[in-house]
């Protein structure tokens, strides 16, 4: 499996544009990971307060929902504006935002001051720009690889994101824990945000190495050439209509939305377990260490999925792969994911990370292969909207349905059962479409079609 992954990566690596796009993706997501850990540490891990699902939901709503609402109104620009320039401009802006956040947290009384809302606004804009940029980079991917390399590229790029985030998170954790003896916590937070600013500046330099028009978009269709940017609602309607015509991509987005709610509830409940059930409110460092171990295992699962999905999909096809990872996620959520010890939850985090990211790779592949380039910017922004809004919904449902400390055996088992049932529902819903339809745009398309005819 590892050999096939390395072989596929080597095949992609021969494309200079792909290499440069990878560099931009790693740098921007590492910087964003540093910024996110800085924000989470400052807001959620104060020794004076104990977070609950409602407070987590509030933070997620502030940082994720605004772009989920306005996403359709800006997605059309990714099908009209130069995508290389989008990368440059967004991270220039984020350099300034990260420096502003670093200055704000130097005020020890910030939480009681009106400028705390300026802090939230800065985080909101920075994270919204990150999602806008990632949608543009995803839409640009097809300009960097050959058509039959979509599956390999779609397995590598979503994995690069978590890998970059892990690097950035490790840097942020290292600053927080490594400077604890010499700096106050708010000073360490300021250093974290300043480091994130340096990372965004590096991303700008890397993006400028890409030729200005190399990432598209290709304005080939009459609609793409004539639709005014202000007609964003019409553009969104057209994108949804396009997804109805390209049913594998549309059904894939619905499926990952359901999975995101269920998996998101698991993640929020697990954070509450580590923060509120395993540890007392004042034991911030111990709680952060446990959450860091669990998050690291989850991130390792994300990375491992890149080596798993191509050989799995080559053997059974994209459609069956989606079913396999959803059912496997359900089983892992029940056992070991419903045993409340540190190591069982860490093990479950790794397994669920593999399954979750494997599903995303499959859905990314469906969107890349079935959606026309004229619609890719809008569809990937719609995808991002679903992905993040469903996570906020998951936090809200956790606050409503699960205990404040996250400790509920019935709840964790029920989430596992629902994940498995999602896989079964996907299999039944797509039965008439057939597996070869889902394998379009992959290196094993012809073999899959032949196997289907033989069966």
Kindly give the residue locations of the regions a language model identified.
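Juxtamembrane intracellular "pre-TM" segments in multi-pass secondary transporters
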Residues: 1-19, 213-254, 444-450
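C-terminal transmembrane bundle of multi-pass solute transporters/carriers
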Residues: 2, 57, 62, 69, ...
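Primarily residues marking transmembrane-helix entry/exit sites
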Residues: 14-22, 53, 112-120, 245-253, ...
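A single, central transmembrane helix in multi-pass transporters
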Residues: 22-41, 176-193, 235-306
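Extracellular/periplasmic helix-loop-helix junction of adjacent transmembrane segments
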Residues: 34, 38-67
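Transmembrane alpha-helix termini and helix-breaking/packing motifs in multi-pass membrane transporters
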Residues: 38-47, 102-111, 167-193, 272, ...
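Helix-loop junctions on the cytosolic side of multi-pass membrane transporters
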Residues: 108, 139, 143, 189, ...
């Amino acid at each position: 499996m590892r050999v096939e992954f390395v072989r596929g990566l080597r095949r992609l690596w021969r494309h200079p544009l792909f290499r440069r796009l990878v560099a931009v993706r790693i740098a921007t997501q590492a910087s964003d990971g540093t910024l996110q850990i800085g924000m989470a540490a400052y807001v959620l891990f104060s020794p004076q307060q104990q977070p609950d699902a409602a407070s987590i939901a509030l933070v997620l709503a502030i940082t994720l929902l605004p772009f989920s609402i306005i996403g359709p109104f800006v997605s059309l620009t990714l099908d009209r504006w130069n995508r290389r320039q989008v990368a440059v401009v967004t991270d220039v802006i984020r350099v300034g935002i990260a420096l502003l956040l670093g200055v704000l947290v130097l005020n020890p009384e910030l939480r009681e001051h009106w400028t705390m809302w300026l802090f939230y606004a800065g985080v909101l804009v920075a994270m919204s720009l990150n999602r806008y940029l990632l949608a543009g980079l995803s839409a640009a991917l097809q300009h960097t690889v050959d058509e039959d390399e979509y599956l390999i590229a779609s397995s590598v790029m979503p994995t690069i994101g978590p890998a970059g985030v892990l690097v950035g998170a490790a840097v942020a954790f290292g600053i927080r824990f490594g400077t604890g003896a010499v700096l106050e916590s708010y000073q360490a937070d300021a250093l974290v945000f300043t480091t994130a600013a340096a990372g965004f500046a590096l991303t700008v330099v890397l993006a400028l190495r890409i030729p200005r028009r190399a990432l598209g978009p290709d304005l080939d269709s009459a609609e793409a050439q004539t639709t005014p940017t202000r007609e964003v609602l019409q553009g969104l309607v057209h994108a949804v209509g396009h997804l109805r015509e390209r049913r594998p991509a549309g059904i894939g987005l619905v499926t990952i939305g359901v999975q995101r709610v269920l998996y998101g509830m698991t993640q929020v409940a697990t954070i509450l377990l580590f923060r509120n059930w395993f540890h007392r409110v004042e034991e911030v460092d111990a709680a952060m260490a446990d959450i860091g171990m669990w998050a690291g295992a989850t991130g390792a699962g994300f990375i491992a999925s890149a080596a798993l999905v191509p050989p799995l999909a080559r053997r059974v096809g994209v459609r069956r792969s989606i079913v396999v990872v959803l059912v496997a996620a359900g089983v892992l959520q029940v056992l070991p994911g419903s045993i409340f010890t540190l190591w069982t939850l860490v093990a479950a985090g790794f397994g669920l990370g593999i399954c979750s990211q494997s599903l995303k790779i499959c859905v990314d592949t469906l969107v890349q292969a079935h959606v026309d380039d004229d619609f890719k910017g809008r569809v990937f922004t719609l995808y991002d909207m679903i992905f993040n809004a469903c996570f906020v919904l998951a936090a809200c449902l956790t606050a409503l349905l699960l205990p404040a400390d996250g400790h509920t055996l019935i709840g964790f088992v029920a989430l596992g059962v629902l994940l498995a049932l999602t896989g079964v529902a996907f299999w039944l819903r797509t039965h008439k479409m057939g597996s070869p339809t889902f394998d379009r745009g992959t290196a094993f398309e012809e073999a899959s079609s032949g196997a289907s005819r033989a069966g």
